């Protein structure tokens, strides 16, 4: 028989550090829309609701730096500073807002995503 009680939690000696050793940035986000917008932890932040106004180029390849399964809500007319962290793994993004469909680090994918974002009013001409 084991000395472990069913359901017992045995914590590690040190706290788990999420998103360690990944590139990070911060952006100020304003919800210019007329209703709240909520963004989940693993959504490619560059492709969030076009009513959210922020520096999208700096958010390319990034997601919210928050625990998995959580989200941040942006209320209409309000500004909020958020921390972003680089998407990990193979860094392939498909779907979401339909702006990026491929390898995040490929120059062609990035330039096409910026063009799509400008054409769909996600970001201003730059």
From Swiss-Prot:
Q: Which GO terms describe its molecular function?
A: urease activity
- What is an annotated GO biological process for this record, any one? urea catabolic process
Answer yes or no on keyword Hydrolase.
Answer: yes
Q: In which pathway does it act?
A: Nitrogen metabolism; urea degradation; CO(2) and NH(3) from urea (urease route): step 1/1
Q: Which UniProt keywords apply?
A: Cytoplasm, Hydrolase
**Substrates-to-products reaction catalysed:** urea + 2 H2O + H(+) = hydrogencarbonate + 2 NH4(+)
Compartments reported by the entry: Cytoplasm
Q: Does the keyword Hydrolase apply?
A: yes
Tell me, how does this one assemble? Heterotrimer of UreA (gamma), UreB (beta) and UreC (alpha) subunits. Three heterotrimers associate to form the active enzyme.
Give the family this protein belongs to, as stated in its UniProt record.
Answer: Belongs to the urease beta subunit family.
The protein, known as:
Urease subunit beta
């Amino acid at each position: 028989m084991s000395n472990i009680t069913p359901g017992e939690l045995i914590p590690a000696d040190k706290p788990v550090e999420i998103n360690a050793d990944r590139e990070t940035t911060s952006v100020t986000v304003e919800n210019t829309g007329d209703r709240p917008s909520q963004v989940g932890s693993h959504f490619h932040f560059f492709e969030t609701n076009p009513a959210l106004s922020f520096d999208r180029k700096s958010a390319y390849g990034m997601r919210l730096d928050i625990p998995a399964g959580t989200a941040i809500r942006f209320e209409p007319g309000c500004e909020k500073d958020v921390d972003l962290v680089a998407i990990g793994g193979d860094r392939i993004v498909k779907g979401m807002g339909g702006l990026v469909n491929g390898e995040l680090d490929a120059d062609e994918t990035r330039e096409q995503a910026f063009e799509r974002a400008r054409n769909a009013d996600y970001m201003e001409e730059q």
